[in-house]
Amino acid sequence: MTGRVTSVRGPVLDIRVEGPLPAIGDVVEVGSLPVVAEIQAHLGAADVRAIALHSTQGIARGETVRTTGGPLRVPTGPAVLGRLLDVAGRPADLGPPIPAGAPRAPILHPAPPLAAQDARFQVFSTGIKVLDLLAPLAQGGKTAMFGGAGVGKTVLVMELIRAMVSGYDGISVFAGVGERSREGHEMLGEMKASGVLDRTVLVYGQMNEPPGARWRVPLTALTIAEGFRDGEGRNVLLLIDNVFRFVQAGAEVSGLLGRMPSRVGYQPTLETEVAALQERIASVGRASVTAIEAVYVPADDFTDPAVTAISAHVDSTVVLSRQLAAEGIYPAIDPLATTSVLLDPAVVGEEHARVAGRLKEAIEHYHELRDVIALLGIEELGREEQLMVGRARKLQRFLTQPFFVAAAYTGMEGRSVPVAETVQGCAAILGGECDDWDEGSLYMIGTLAEARAREEARRRKGAA
């Protein structure tokens, strides 16, 4: 079927169709490029309204429109590995075209039925001490990383990609949603340099692209991830940076379509759109899609409707703290605000859960005493409280570590630490084994054995 463009208002296209109307969610191709647009409303017996997924520059009234008969279909499978794609699955890396025979799948379809999903909790080990100890990630689950601008979300996402490739022989699919083009270019270059690009698919809808592209890019990336899970039986790590921009793009689309906004100007379908994305992320059979979602928190306001809508769907919540980043604690993960449903003795074991609980108690007690220390000095505290404060500060520094993906900037080789060694190290600090150590010996290291060697070297140097 064909039609003609009758109105162009930015990314909004009104189209008169010859024949039966295309269904809501179907895509049409406009012009010779072609520009892909998704049907969003039926205006009359022969008129529809669509949101363009590409720039409409050069599109005019009277332009020819071709219907496709279904939702947007994107390529999946081995043909897309190592490639940078746009929202429609077209190469954006100046490489060769995707082979015509590559399998394709629609980006709009229901979540897997409940009976097919694997609800068992299996831990995804990252080698990042603070995550594995305090916020174990679930295979087939969803983790949200909340934080404002400049606190380290993107670096943490890249380190998790490296962990999936090196530790699980898995595939990573990265969705760049509404972020800076410069950051996307840097990530592509760093992945090439680190050797993980051939096991990764990048799907970008950057901030300079129309709202329709930014709105649908997470679904394109998720569809590619589902293709590896269902078609190849591979474990997939889906990383979305930034899922808040997906919500923001949905609000733009809603406004362009003339819908009445809801609280704080968000779209009235906010909860529905977030759920449609999140509920498709699951384990099916022996393979899983595990999602790590960076969430920008506007003005550091965790009561923002978009933030609360996203947090309702996740298994683990990782909160990045601007104060910790200012103190040089990296990764700047707040141990008190970070939570996970997997931090349960039945899942991680009694010792792990006990040490994590004691660590949180120690750091919380230290935070309660910080004002007193700032006013009167630590000498005014009792002996036991001084020891507890010292241990809490040492625990904070022990949970820092250099990342592999940041080695070029920090000059420090990355570390990946098994969770058993993390638990053992924290237990030793809580038990007083490191009370007479310098805090610097525990900063930016891997295991406690490495910290012990650094402390012994410091003492030898002091004795000399």
Swiss-Prot record:
UniProt keyword Translocase present: yes
Tell me what reaction this enzyme catalyses: ATP + H2O + 4 H(+)(in) = ADP + phosphate + 5 H(+)(out)
GO MF annotations in UniProt: ATP binding; ATP hydrolysis activity; proton-transporting ATP synthase activity, rotational mechanism
Q: Which GO terms describe its cellular component?
A: plasma membrane; proton-transporting ATP synthase complex
User: What does the record give as EC number?
Assistant: 7.1.2.2
Report keywords, A-Z. ATP synthesis, ATP-binding, Cell inner membrane, Cell membrane, CF(1), Hydrogen ion transport, Ion transport, Membrane, Nucleotide-binding, Plasmid, Translocase, Transport
**Main subcellular localisation:** membrane
Which residues are listed for ATP binding in this entry?
Answer: 147-154
Q: Which CDD domains does the UniProt record give? A: ATP-synt_F1_beta_C (cd18110), ATP-synt_F1_beta_N (cd18115), F1-ATPase_beta_CD (cd01133)
How does the record classify its membrane topology? Peripheral membrane protein
Say if the entry is tagged with keyword Magnesium: no
Places the protein is found: Cell inner membrane
Q: Which domain of life is it from?
A: Bacteria
Entry's InterPro entries?
AAA+_ATPase, ATP-synt_VA_C, ATP_synth_F1_bsu, ATPase_alpha/beta_chains, ATPase_F1/V1/A1_a/bsu_N, ATPase_F1/V1/A1_a/bsu_N_sf, ATPase_F1/V1/A1_a/bsu_nucl-bd, ATPase_F1/V1_b/a_C
> Sorted alphabetically, which Gene3D superfamilies does this protein's record hold?
2.40.10.170, Bovine Mitochondrial F1-atpase, Atp Synthase Beta Chain, Chain D, domain 3, P-loop containing nucleotide triphosphate hydrolases
Note the subunit structure: F-type ATPases have 2 components, CF(1) - the catalytic core - and CF(0) - the membrane proton channel. CF(1) has five subunits: alpha(3), beta(3), gamma(1), delta(1), epsilon(1). CF(0) has four main subunits: a(1), b(1), b'(1) and c(9-12).
Family that this chain belongs to: Belongs to the ATPase alpha/beta chains family.
The role this protein plays is: Produces ATP from ADP in the presence of a proton gradient across the membrane. The catalytic sites are hosted primarily by the beta subunits.
| Stated name of the protein | ATP synthase subunit beta 2
Origin organism is Cereibacter sphaeroides (strain ATCC 17023 / DSM 158 / JCM 6121 / CCUG 31486 / LMG 2827 / NBRC 12203 / NCIMB 8253 / ATH 2.4.1.) (Rhodobacter sphaeroides)
Give the lineage: Bacteria, Pseudomonadati, Pseudomonadota, Alphaproteobacteria, Rhodobacterales
